[in-house]
Every structure is written in C-alpha cells, then in structure tokens.
Amino acid sequence: MAWHDGRVVDDDATTVIQDVRPWGGDPADVGVAGDRIAWVRPAGTTPPAPGAEVVEGRGLLALPGLVNTHAHADKSWWGLPWQSYGGEGGTQGRIAHERARRDELGIPSAPVAERVLREYLRTGTTRVRTHVDVDLGLGLRGIEAVREAAAALDGAIELTVVAFPQDGVLRRPGVLELLDRAARAGAEHVGGLDPALIDRDPVGQLDGLFRIAAEHGCGLDIHLHEPGDLGAFEIDLILDRVERDGIAPGKVNVAHGFAVVDVDPARRRDLLDRMGALGVTMTTVAPVRMRQLPLAEMDAAGVRFGLGTDGIRDLWSPYGDGDLLGIAWQYARAGGMVRDEDLRRVVELATRDGAAFVTDEVHDLVPGSRADVVLLDAENPMDALVRRVPRSAVVAGGRVVDLAALAARPWE
C-alpha cells in the first residue's frame, strides 16, 4: 500500500478491473498482479496506483474465464476459404475423408492451431483440454504444432493435450507405441476411441491404454460414442481397471458417453454411482438431436463433468464456432433447463468447475487464482447464458486481450 493524493492506493496491482459484478454480486474492483488476482474489494475503495493499467468495468458482469474441456484444436479449416462437405458419413467415412484432405489444408500445423486458439480466446476461453490426432501418418507432429501455437499466445491460454488415436489403436499396428511415445514426451493424457466398434477388441484397447497410464502416470481420456448396453459394458471395463490400478480421481475421463443416457434409470444410477466413487469424470459437447447427459443425476452421484466445443469448422462438419458459452447454452436448452439454479450450474461448469480438467488450481474470481476474467453486459450468469451475450472484455493470465485484433472473419 502507498499514499497518493492523500488516499491509500494499492501499489502491488499492475492492472485494476474497476466496477464489475463478480458472478452478478455487489460491485467490486479486482486487482491483478502479474498473472494472478491479488485482491477483490468493494468498488471504489482502493484507487489504482499511478501507472497501473485500468479496465473500466462499468458495472458489467464478471465471470472466470471459460474452460473448453473437449476440443480438437489441431484440425480445423478456420481461417481458410469455405470447404464443402465431402466423403461418406459415419465415423469411418469421416476418418477416411479427413485423411484424404488434411495435408492439402495444412492440417495439422501451428498456424492452423493458432487460428483456432485465438478464436477460443476471443470468446473468453482461457483454459483448454484439446485432443490432438496421433497416427502413423502424423506421428507426434500435431502435438508439437499445438504446443507451438499455444506458446505463440504467450500464456493467454493454458492448455493440456490428449494424444488421440482418431484412426484406432489396435487396428493400426504401431499406434499404441506412438501413444506411449507421446506420454513419454509429456502429453498429459492419452486417448482412446470406441474400443469395440473401431478396434473390435475392447479389452485389448483398454488394457493397452491403461498400461501406458500405469507406466507414465498420464491421464486417460477416452472417446466413447458406443450406445446402450455395449457402451455401458465398456464403461464397466474402464471402471474395473481404474479400481484395479488404484488410479487417482480425475485421471480418467469418458468423453461423450452416450450409453449413460441410453440405459434404463437403474443401470444409469449404478454406472454414475460407481463413476463418482472412483473419480471418473465425463465431458460432453452437447450434441444436437440427442438426449443430454443428466446433470442433476451426475451431480448427485459426484461425477465431475465438463463442456467442450469438439471440432469446429473441420473436415467432420462445417458447424462450430469455438464459443464455449454457446455450447453451454446448447446443453441447457436441449436439456430443458429453465430454473435459475440449473442455469447457473451450467455456467459454473463452463467456467469455475470445468477448470479441473486442465489444472489443479482454483479457477475463480478470488485472490490467488490465475487472472482469467470475462466481462459481459448481462444482468447475472443466467442472463449471460440464455442470451449468449458477447464478451465485452477478456483478461487472460493477467493481460488484457485486444479483442479487436482477434476479430477476423472465419475465412481470412
């Protein structure tokens, strides 16, 4: 603290975000020192020190940075001219089409990934868990490209990587070894994909993945689109191995997990109770025309849950714009959520509670947290969600983001 013009000022905060309403509460000022929130105090009570950067909040709603827990930042044509949808439908058809065209589009590369990350940042996402393709044609090149892209943003986005075998594991000899190499090289997680429908060997695929996790201490994040009893059986196989190996809570995630909503209520309750007890998490991209994962049941069972954009504007689908708040809206709307407590809970998933998929740190508007702050012209979190309010300002890792500089048209 110091005196300036006869008043006590804070000389630690290098940036002060003035007159905002954290989570829609009372007006406050937020002091930022380096990349951390230093303090949160009633608005107007602590003038900024001379030379401090000031962000005029004008009474806007303040939320923690958005968290994208299931992304594919390596494989978009964002920033390129329109690419017409081609190839066959279904998982196998999309895999084949992607492999036929990705090289001509520069997928993967650092420029591709950086364009995607910049769009995430423009809409307020500051933490990302991204799946990155690992296969015999690419090796680990995609992971290197995504890491380079994140570094180019100089810490604005905190990112963790899932080495993802999009084309299968056992059906492509050598991929399991690539996943092992990725884990040894520092990939935080290793992925899997539909062990029965893709590899035709759920036990073999899962045993291979869990062996890598045991050897390297990495997490597992497994795409599981398989429906009904088949998918539920595979979730049981995953849970059996988590229990057998004593894997710590939060280290194993089931992405999509459509089977959870397909099975009858008693079977679903058993699955969720076991997942909650073992600390196995779930992520969803809130797919349209499908039943959504049951938030109230998952909360009751203690299953931690995150939201993600999936791929955006890519060779799988032209849809998607990278706005995690839009995915949160889609999840809430498709799930018929209208009560304040449910709408606010979805905003918490998209911000504060989603961060555990990327970091062990607290992610909130409190002292000590990384200074990731999003300002929106909204009455409260519920209003921000249902109107998908544009972001008025973004502070990422303590630095004010130049949103105008990031505002490029998707084809440029």
Predicted regions and their residues:
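N-terminal metal-binding scaffold of metallo-dependent hydrolase/deaminase domains
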Residues: 1-49, 381
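His/Asp/Glu-enriched, well-ordered alpha-helical/loop segment
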Residues: 244-252, 296-378
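C-terminal cap of metal-dependent C-N hydrolases
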Residues: 365-412
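Active-site gating loops and adjacent loop-to-helix segments of metal-dependent hydrolytic enzymes
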Residues: 76-109, 234-253, 271, 321-338
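Divalent metal-coordination and catalytic microenvironments
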Residues: 20, 35, 59, 70, ...
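Active-site core of metal-dependent hydrolases
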Residues: 156, 163-172, 184-293, 304, ...
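Alpha-helical scaffold segments that flank or form the walls of functional sites
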Residues: 77-131, 137-152, 177-184
